[in-house]
């Protein structure tokens, strides 16, 4: 029958994906690091899916969107099935703040407006909505429109240490190197 995880994955693929027009996966960084809020969008699932996902990422008040070639996660497998998808990252260290939850709520409303599910006027009525305060990244630049200037990373590089041990970052998330 497979592991519990395999059963969950099969249920998602069988019951969720066939009816999905768009998928968004919310994450909270990794247990070992803090991250600047960003969105992964799939680039390994064809031009149509990539364009729809990238346009959706651009509609969100996040500083970064990152092209992803992943093929085996919830959002990336949805993309392989022809469903535009995003993975949003915010926070880290296995915890979250109310501000991060509020920022995710705003991002979800922004996505629903982008997908023409809700009218743009709904954004103003979201309780406590303030785009200038929704982004926790120290290097964010809020444009006169209230939107956050967003940049794109086309090639993601992961650094790996040559040996085992503990990682103690010497810089904070969002620092310019």
Where are these regions (language model features)?
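Structured catalytic-domain cores with a bias toward divalent-metal coordination
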Residues: 1-177
């Amino acid at each position: 029958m497979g592991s519990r995880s395999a059963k969950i994955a099969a249920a998602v693929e069988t019951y969720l994906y066939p009816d999905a027009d768009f998928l968004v996966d919310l994450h909270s960084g990794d247990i070992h690091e803090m991250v600047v809020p960003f969105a992964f969008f799939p680039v390994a699932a064809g031009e149509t899916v990539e364009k729809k996902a990238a346009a959706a990422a651009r509609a969100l008040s996040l500083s970064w969107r990152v092209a992803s070639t992943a093929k085996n996660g919830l959002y990336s497998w949805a993309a392989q099935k022809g469903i535009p998808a995003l993975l949003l990252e915010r926070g880290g260290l296995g915890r979250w703040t109310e501000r991060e939850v509020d920022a995710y709520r705003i991002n979800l409303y922004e996505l629903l407006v982008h997908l023409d599910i809700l009218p743009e006027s709904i954004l103003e009525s979201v309780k406590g909505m303030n785009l200038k305060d929704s982004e926790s990244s120290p290097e964010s630049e809020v444009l006169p429109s209230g939107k956050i200037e967003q940049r794109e990373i086309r090639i993601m590089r992961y650094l790996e240490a040559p040996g085992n041990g503990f990682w103690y970052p010497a810089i904070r998330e969002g620092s310019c190197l």
